[in-house]
């Protein structure tokens, strides 16, 4: 390959390297933002959950949304009313990764096919539901739909209240849960310790024995449960996006590594070609000098 071609190829690779580096920086910024959102939503959800359960203990509240928070006392009833509502969210897979098969295998092993119901988000989840004839109540094409969190919150509150589900499980791709699910109701079963430092949150819990609640306790509880669900759903949607973004970062890092390797190889070729050209030039000059010396010798005067 000629030197000019190598230099042009190096220039093109440098341009690609710059573009991919910019994409990598965007992924890093997005991960930082998602981490902030994740902490915000999960911390809010935890504090609201603690407030709700504190009020339940203090005032012995009977509420349909809280009926399973002390489920261990009613083991017999739990065996009868063991229906589960599943929410399964899949992201678009851009980087040739198999990110969801392990979750789907676990779902199929866990569900009671005739009793459990599903809300499916994303094309992968919808396809999974069709392939396995699941009881699907609602589908959403992706997690970027406007007001998705609000819609899910309303659906969960209605379904959990009136259809007597024992649990609401949420499945996403997350390194915080390798092949399982997150239980968002009963709220006491959610794994907050995987998202936040619980000790730092304890100091922010309100002592409801020292405050008055307006306009009334039931309305306050309804609002708090709604806000809890909004925050916990946003936590899991953010975690799903975080995992997708991290995969994007890994992919760009791999591309950058490959580009660096190729640039190093091309630079070595350029150096070798330049060296060869210099050697050829030196040899050419040497031959020219030898020819000039020969010509000088041929032009000498000899006496007889």
Curated annotation (Swiss-Prot):
Domain of life: Bacteria
Identification of the protein by name: Uncharacterized protein UU050
Organism of this sequence: Ureaplasma parvum serovar 3 (strain ATCC 700970)
